[in-house]
Amino acid sequence: MPRLTQIGKDQAHPNAQAIYKLLFKDRDPVVQPGTDTGTPGNWWTVFAVSPDAFDHAVAGFQYYRGKRKLDPKLRELGQTRAGWGRGSQFVYSQHCKASRGVGLSEEQIQSIPHWQVAECYSPVERAVLAYTDGMVLQGGRVADGIFAALKKHLSDVEIMELTYIVGMYDMHAMISKTLRLEYDDVDDRIVEVAAPTGASSDVMRMVDQEKKE
């Protein structure tokens, strides 16, 4: 379950109601969840808790889906890699699908997790993936050599668009995991695994040197 309250159809603000109508038809998505793409749809119902946040996020979607200088294939490489790098199954899964929609090959999509050793990417695609890793995995610490490689292929406008969109999707991946939305509603796998009954609590005692008499 998401960690925040979900806003139903009757309580949603006008912009959310309009999108609910598109996604869920006449259903209340809290009572009858599910979208045509197979997601529960609770990203929308949780973001609707704050109408301003909902509208701001939707404006971000409209930004990247609008008329941009950046090639949509490069955009989706950045978004999908951001989802993978941040560990968001929701963002990664949704943008694998979106990547097919803009014409990336199945090999390119399936190789995003291990792009460094894949041979299916052009120099500009590799530069975009490396730049995304610098932003997401290194917290914005993009090496000069990576930026120089990107500048060989993209204009300042295209780099600004890429930076904004990747940063936005890094944020969405973090929010999705934090609030346990959609496919990121999973338990943390880093927990203690119980030892057998009667086992010593000193798990590293076998490496101790025997004390000399």
Regions found by a protein language model. Give the residues of each.
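C-terminal end-helix/capping segment
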Residues: 100-107, 176-206
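Short alpha-helical scaffolding segments that buttress acidic/His motifs in well-ordered protein cores
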Residues: 44-47, 57-64, 77-83, 112-113, ...
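Secretory/endomembrane lumenal or extracellular ectodomains immediately following the signal peptide
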Residues: 1-72, 191-213
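Short acidic alpha-helix initiation/capping motifs at coil-to-helix transition points
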Residues: 34-35, 52-57, 87-92, 127, ...
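Acidic/histidine-rich alpha-helical segments that form the ligand environment
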Residues: 122-164
